[in-house]
Amino acid sequence: MKMEIRRDITGSILDIGGGGEGIIGRIYGGQVIAIDNREEELDEAPDCCEKRLMDATALQFPDRSFDHVTFFYALMYMNRDEQKKALGEAVRVLRPGGKIHLWDTDIDSAYPEPFVVDLEIVTDRFSVHTSYGIVKKDAQDADTILRDLHDLGLKTCRCEKERGQFHIVGEKAPEQ
């Protein structure tokens, strides 16, 4: 599936699961601190932003540290409990008025057969063809993630769904 990503985020960005292809880091460079819980994924990512080994369910940043938090095909690698904790941590480190940006996929079943999504990612700076795959018992869908964000007090700014892929943007209240 072809996916176009516009360079439209200003301010500081925490990219959760930012290892591997490092898509968000490649687009936004010095605006980004990319974290991943696997050192080999960080080693594989291009050296275009700051990279840190860290667990998304226990972020080592103070409250209200970032203007934006991104999850680019990262939630699919977490079970439901980890997803909820990671989203809660993302809201904690998000500044009032900041936004969470999620790109991911609906997964009906990824067990026992693996689930794989094949993407062609196009930006104004580069294009890359990659696949993301997982074997896990938890399913996921955009509606569940939307409910999680709502339960955390975020307002939905964008929810685009196309052929099983989704892009959701949630905004933290200015006074939250």
Regions found by a protein language model. Name each.
Residues L14-A58:
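Class I SAM-dependent methyltransferase SAM/SAH-binding core
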Residues K84-P96:
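A short glycine-rich, Lys/Arg-flanked "PGG" loop and its adjoining helix->strand segment in the class I
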Residues L152-Q176:
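Core SAM-dependent methyltransferase catalytic element
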Residues T57-V69:
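A short acidic, Gly/Pro-enriched loop at the edge of an enzyme's catalytic core
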Residues H68-E82:
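A short SAM/SAH-binding and catalytic strip from SAM-dependent methyltransferases
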Residues M1-G11:
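Conserved alpha-helix/loop element of class I SAM-dependent methyltransferases that forms part
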Residues I23, W103-C159:
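C-terminal alpha-helical "lid/dimerization" subdomain adjacent to the S-adenosyl-L-methionine
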